[in-house]
Amino acid sequence: MQFPLSIISSLVTVLTITLQALPIFTLSTCRSFCGNIPIKYPFGIDDGCGAVQFRQMLNCSADLFFITPSGGYKVQSIDYNKKTLTVYDPAMSTCSILQPHHDFIMTDIQSAIMPPSADTVFALLNCSIDSPVLNHYKNLCFNFSGHSCDELYGGCNAFRVFHLLSNSSPPCCFTGYDTVRYMSMNILDCSHYTSIINTDNLKGLGPLDWVYGIKLSYSLPDTGCERCSESGGTCGFDTETQGMMCLCSSSFNATRECGKNC
Ligand SMILES: *[C@@H]1O[C@H](CO)[C@@H](O)[C@H](O)[C@H]1NC(C)=O
Ligand SMILES: *[C@@H]1O[C@H](CO)[C@@H](O)[C@H](O)[C@H]1NC(C)=O
Ligand SMILES: *[C@@H]1O[C@H](CO)[C@@H](O)[C@H](O)[C@H]1NC(C)=O
Ligand SMILES: *[C@@H]1O[C@H](CO)[C@@H](O)[C@H](O)[C@H]1NC(C)=O
């Protein structure tokens, strides 16, 4: 038996109208991984996800990058328990490679909410004798577990050149991020720097065994994310008003928690 053409045609019309009337559903907008790095609150790689204070700090293009005014730095790991994010700047000098210096610059917001951790030490190398950190600001340099400049110049292939060229040991300085933040390398008058993480237990360990990079220590904004995640939602924010929003499903966002919209 054949359906009369008119019935088929009206079915098609009804179907078309129904399909057009359906709201356009978007899939969950927050990716929870970038490669093998989990992305959780307060971070987000899709706009509207995570805490608004951390908006546009990460991008995920094959690898995860931390974006600052001085460039994108590859994220090595995020420790959500210790609230740290470790980045590595491939343009930075380390014990094994000497590269032209390149300031690490963060925005004011970044410096405020995720400054380098206390166990990240910056080593300013090959400083001129006129450097402020050897004169007026010499108290910014500290005793780094008894390590010396000569240890770096002598123990690292990359830094041996400082020793060779000057036939002596040019000064160096172990300091915290604030020194680098407030004075650019040009003002500091040191030709290179490197930074070392996890510095709490480096007494007696030579520079070949240090871990180079920058560890940022972030704080969680107090936006009521717990309530949202306990209700099964994902914390995000309204991209226009920047107000916190609880993302409940692909078709429903609540202001505070899923199940209630008040
Ligand atoms: C929910 O919020 C996200 C992030 O701001 C947004 O991308 C999405 O379009 C919103 N969905 C609805 C249904 O409003
Ligand atoms: C992400 O950051 C990296 C490093 O700065 C850059 O090369 C890449 O183009 C950025 N990707 C997007 C999608 O912005
Ligand atoms: C060390 O610093 C001096 C300036 O104080 C500079 O002329 C020299 O090129 C630097 N050495 C290297 C290997 O960059
Ligand atoms: C630096 O600290 C070490 C202990 O970590 C100590 O043995 C050494 O004497 C100190 N050096 C100076 C110059 O204060």
Residue ranges of model-derived segments:
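Extracellular/lumenal glycoprotein segments
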Residues: 2-262
